[in-house]
């Protein structure tokens, strides 16, 4: 089996030349070969050793004779990108007459920094720059993964520098690379032609441009071995790698590694999907759905029986790359999906959501890339206001192989679409986006795409509104910076949002809360009161003091509902009442610092207890795992799956946005109290958030 991997392609190349259909692998190999020829002609690239934090700077130099571009790359080491403050110190470009210019005297024509901006002649705090304890008066700092491109137009003959990590980096490591080409346009063309394949590949590399300019096949080999390290049994893949290593031609090596990458990625994806195939959970959901009006148990019982047999047979054959085993596993996943998406709560066959087009960064995205705040203490005012490619979409044909997507509304100004709320009538939705002057406001659009309008009108030039909700009587509750105060520990840089009540007919605006710190997520409870999350700072351990509150819609009788007097959890976001319950709700628990806004999915019931784990009914999808109280700042760092923005269908089934593991995409899932996790929509290059079933 392993030998066939190489022999097939070699036999084809040895025969008569035939016209081949271009695919992403062939196109990539061709582009890499052309770029490698250009690099070799210029004796490039020049690579440093793996340089770690606190090491002394290492000299690097390059011959620039006849070159039009100087490309300086800082690439992260195998330990990730934390504190990788790569620095080009005492860097200068030398002309043929011996005169020179310091690199810090020039501005790059193009640059990307892995964190913040490039910095000249200072460390990241504005102090004199040190590497290994030595002070440098001339330096350019560019965090990995980063690149700086200088158009030098054959003016210089030599480049010299000392490279290392700024002493602020107590951890971290960087590879430094000097090149004469940076294939930004070539990478863009490839990505446009093969967005799915190149988008997925980019999740495993430090940028398509750097990958295209690699001088050998080691990058492809590392990609495959990295994927293999995630497999329960990697023997097949590792043996195939050994076979490819014997090949002498670089292009052939690259091609075969990329073919092996495709198969290994397929195995990895199946392993992940199979880890969520829980027959006990599926049986429990099946038996529960039999009690629901509209569920055709007779139709789906044969599918369940087939799945039972597939699970009994097992799926270990996928690890040998056997095609029949791979197809059988894919059929089992499809059978699971068929059963669970037969849920009558999806009979409306429409789900509203916000879609963010993320391109090659989709696998690395977290909640702030989907329009949320970048931390757990700020309101929407601190979130990014522009640079998004986002729209509100309607998903249909949910049970089919090809889910249909219809764009309902897309901001024209690059704003995100946040805080998506369905109207009581099910024919329109409320959301937050920026106005032409970049202030946030609450807007509405009908589900047919018509009727777009601003909902809150106010003459004050510095007030903003966001995080709104409909009241049954037609009024609106939203958050606003109406108090003109900021979060204390960041010197007021993050504005605080308190709630206001707005009457559209009269444009009357009244402040409801007068809290020192933020309110979030007002939502109407089943008893007509409004619950929300309140963060309080004074005289409290503020890392752990985001409390679920409730009040009358007019702001009277503000009371704690859950979490007062407890340090677990730190934060409870995205709360939604459970249909048919007077007190129970679902929400996301998260930390203070660390991962922002997303976290663990919890069902609460304050009727059981008003704080701590005692008030938690269960964690989804871990019904049999006890919830252990943990007093920890970064509560959900390293926790997977990550969930955000749940919507209850009833008290057992929920729609939610989720990222199941660090390499995954943000998709929309149907989850339940039985531990089933079923994907409704997940697409390469995109991220989804705020799913809501369309029901009238």
Q: Positions of the model-derived regions?
A:
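Gly-Asp-aromatic-enriched flexible segments
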Residues: 17-188
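Short, conserved, GDST-rich strand-edge loop motifs in beta-rich repeat architectures
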Residues: 356-387, 434, 439, 478-495, ...
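Residue-level detector of Asp-centered blade-edge/turn motifs that repeat once per structural unit
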Residues: 346-347, 424-425, 471-473, 525-527, ...
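Beta-propeller blade signature
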Residues: 176-179, 390-396, 443-448, 493-506, ...
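Beta-propeller domains
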Residues: 308, 315, 357-413, 437, ...
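Asp-box/WD-like beta-propeller blade repeats and closely related beta-sheet repeat scaffolds
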Residues: 438-501, 506-520
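Multi-bladed beta-propeller domains
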Residues: 332, 401-415, 446-464, 502-517, ...
